[in-house]
Amino acid sequence: MAPNIRKHHPLLKMINNSLIDLPTPSNISAWWNFGSLLGICLMTQILTGLLLAAHYTPDTSLAFSSVAHTCRNVQYGWLIRNLHANGASFFFICIYLHIGRGFYYGSYLYKETWNTGVVLLLTLMATAFVGYVLPWGQMSFWGATVITNLFSAIPYIGQTLVEWAWGGFSVDNPTLTRFFTLHFLLPFMISGLTIIHLTFLHESGSNNPLGITSNSDKIPFHPYFSLKDILGFTIMLLLLTSIALFSPNLLGDPENFTPANPLVTPPHIKPEWYFLFAYAILRSIPNKLGGVLALAASVLILFLAPFLHKSKQRTMTFRPLSQLLFWLLVANLMILTWIGSQPVEHPFIIIGQLASITYFTIILILFPITSALENKMLKY
């Protein structure tokens, strides 16, 4: 019998082992769809971004006009821009749900996969930040100024570091040029990291909602999960196109319709919605260095997840106390997101400070204690 090209061709067999004949646990739920949805987000963003870059001019005097020109004069330029801007929001929705799934079901115990995932999140955040600066509107400019300025809190080398990053003494043309360069480069770095992420995942195989070994009950990825993924793609792309066509500026800041002006500061400087939780934590500490450290810790704390796992069970499926704590954490993150969008005044200051303390307390203290308590209750 002739050899099957899908299983023997050096390149095709890699694709086959990753997407077609991949042994997959039969009981993974829709929460396992977000990995592939992130892949679709990445491909959509690279495609729309490439088309936008073809019409963009990274120069302070032309950037704003070039984006306006793309929307007015390029065939479907408005649609490409709206898909790209809102695609970023969907990217973050998917990655937050993906991380939440990993946290709930104990997927972080695959340490290599989890750590590469956190690095992916950090790279995505960097990409989104530099991308937001490119239209060179008011919020682009002041957002870049405020966030890059945080590096000056680093003792001794801070100020030098900031001026080196800016390429001058303020956010100006060199800054915009290098941000465009980085925004073009980073998505390809994300693609490379994604391959590493998947390589580590396929070493161990997928986790499942029960958190027990599923070697005795595996089914091929195709057609079962390929079809399930396509359903996910359809729903997400339908939502993305709907928002891009019906309400493209829903998540944006009206301030960004005004060209950047270093002489006028917007009344409320705030990042896009997906960074608001971290921004609230940054603002809740009345000290610059302390705020920067808290901001970094709010995301880097994910690296500690494998070490904070004290339960004898992997997932939270059969751990009601940990479940309660998990949803408290989700609610807390939503409160932080809301606080990040509000002005710095009473009562928002104190709410933000309490929510920030709660965020770290739940993850660092309450989760391990609750896990130990649940172990005791089960008489382990």
UniProtKB/Swiss-Prot annotation:
The chain crosses the membrane at residues 34-54, 78-99, 114-134, 179-199, 227-247, 289-309, 321-341, 348-368. Disulfide bonds: none annotated. A ubiquinone binds at H202. GO terms for cellular component: mitochondrial inner membrane; respiratory chain complex III. Heme b b562 binds at H84, H183. GO terms for biological process: mitochondrial electron transport, ubiquinol to cytochrome c. InterPro entries: Cyt_b/b6_C, Cyt_b/b6_C_sf, Cyt_b/b6_N, Cytb/b6-like_sf, Cytochrome_b, Cytochrome_b_C_euk/bac, Cytochrome_b_N_euk/bac, Di-haem_cyt_TM. Its main location: mitochondrion. It is found in: Mitochondrion inner membrane. Heme b b566 binds at H98, H197. Keywords: Electron transport, Heme, Iron, Membrane, Metal-binding, Mitochondrion, Mitochondrion inner membrane, Respiratory chain, Transmembrane, Transmembrane helix, Transport, Ubiquinone. The cytochrome bc1 complex contains 11 subunits: 3 respiratory subunits (MT-CYB, CYC1 and UQCRFS1), 2 core proteins (UQCRC1 and UQCRC2) and 6 low-molecular weight proteins (UQCRH/QCR6, UQCRB/QCR7, UQCRQ/QCR8, UQCR10/QCR9, UQCR11/QCR10 and a cleavage product of UQCRFS1). This cytochrome bc1 complex then forms a dimer. Heme 1 (or BL or b562) is low-potential and absorbs at about 562 nm, and heme 2 (or BH or b566) is high-potential and absorbs at about 566 nm. Belongs to the cytochrome b family. This is Cytochrome b.
